[in-house]
Amino acid sequence: MAIITMKSLLEAGVHFGHQVKRLDPRMKRFIFSERNEIHILDLQKTLQGIKDSYELVQRVIKDGKKVLFVGTKKQASEIIEQEARRSDMPYVNNRWLGGMLSNFNTIRKSVQKLKKLEKMEVDGTFDMISKKEISQLNREKFKLAKNLTGIKDMETLPGAIFIIDPKREQIAINEARKLKIPIISVVDTNCNPDVIDCPIPGNDDAIRSVALFTKIISDAILESDKEVGIQIIENLNEEDLMKEIEIKNDKSDSIEEGRSNL
C-alpha cells in the first residue's frame, strides 16, 4: 500500500507555486497562501487530487487498459521513462507528435516501420545491403525511435493519460479531450485545471516533486491487482504546516529558485 504524508509533499517542494503575477485565475481554488510574492499551494487539495488520481488509475488498469505517461520537459523526461518502464506502461518523453492519439492508426504505421527496421538490423538483412543503404536506414530508425520508442507496444488507445506540465503538453491534452480519454495532470499555479479530469495541484518544475507524483501513479498501476488503495496521513495541522512552510522558505535564497533545486 502506498503511503503519502503531508510532510513528504513538503519535503519534495510540492507546495511551491509560481510568482503571483503568473497565476492562472482558474487555479485560485487551489491556493493556500502567498509568501514573498510566490503562491503556496493547498496541500490538502493536493492530497485529494492524489487520491482521486490513484483510484482512477486503478480502475483503468483493472479494465485492462494502459496509462500513457507524458512529460517532455527536461525535469520530467528521464523520470517519466523510468517510472513508465517500471510499471510497464507506454510513455512519451521527447516530443509529442501531432496525431499520437487523434491519428493513432497513422502513428501505428510509423511504429511498425520502426519495428521492421529494428528487425532488419538483427536478422541479417543489413549484411546483404551496402554501407550507404545501412547508413540511410539507421538514420531513419534513429529518427523514429527518438519519438516512438515509448509507445512501440501501445497497440490501442490508452485508458488514461498522465501529464507533467499541461501548459507544455497542450496538444496531447487537446487530443485526449477530443477522444474523451481521462486526463490526470499535475497542475501548477500557471495552469488551467478545468481541462483536466483529475487535477493534482503541485509544483511541476522541481525534480523531486515531479518524481514523487510520477512514482505515485506508477505505484497505483503496480498495486492495482492487489486490491489495495492509498493511505494518506495528514500528519500536520494548519499551524504546523505554516511553520514547515516558513522553514522551507528560510532554507532557500528564494522560493522561485527552490522550485528547481529541491
Curated annotation (Swiss-Prot):
Superkingdom of origin: Bacteria
Provide this UniProt record's keywords sorted from A to Z: Ribonucleoprotein, Ribosomal protein
Gene Ontology molecular functions? structural constituent of ribosome
* Keyword Ribosomal protein carried by entry: yes
Q: Output one GO BP term.
A: translation
Q: Which residues cross the membrane?
A: none
Q: Which SUPFAM superfamilies match?
A: Ribosomal protein S2 (SSF52313)
Concerning Pfam families, the annotation shows: Ribosomal_S2
- In the UniProt record, does the keyword Ribosomal protein occur? yes
Q: Which GO terms describe its cellular component?
A: cytosolic small ribosomal subunit
The protein's matches in NCBIfam families, at most eight in alphabetical order, are given as: rpsB_bact
Q: Which family does it belong to?
A: Belongs to the universal ribosomal protein uS2 family.
Q: What is this protein called?
A: Small ribosomal subunit protein uS2
Which lineage ranks, top first, belong to the organism behind this chain?
Bacteria, Pseudomonadati, Spirochaetota, Spirochaetia, Spirochaetales
